[in-house]
C-alpha cells in the first residue's frame, strides 16, 4: 500500500504585488495568517500565485522567502511547472535546493503534447526533482 505524501488541507497562496514587484511584507502576513489557523501545507507560485506572469528569478525569490518564513512548520509545495520541460526541471531542482518539500507541475500549456509526450514530460521532471510531484 502507498503512503500518503501529504495530508490535510493545503492552501494555494496568492503572490501579492506592489507597483515595484513582489510585496514580501504582505506575503509574510498571508503566510502567518494561514499558519496561525492550522493549514497543513502551503502552495506557492501556482496558478493562484501568478507564476505564469513571473520571471524565473521572481519565482525562485518567492519560493525561498516562503521556505524561510515557514521554517519547517508545514510542507511547502512549490509551483515549478513550465511550458518547457528543461525549464520545469531546472525550476524544480532549484525549488528543492531552496527547501521545497514537493512540487506542483502544470501540464505544458502552449504546445499540444501527445499523451506519450505528457508522460515523458512529467517523468523527466519527477526523475530530476527527487521530491513528490503533484
Name each model-derived stretch:
Residues 2-134:
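Active-site beta->alpha loop and helix N-cap motifs at the rims of alpha/beta catalytic domains
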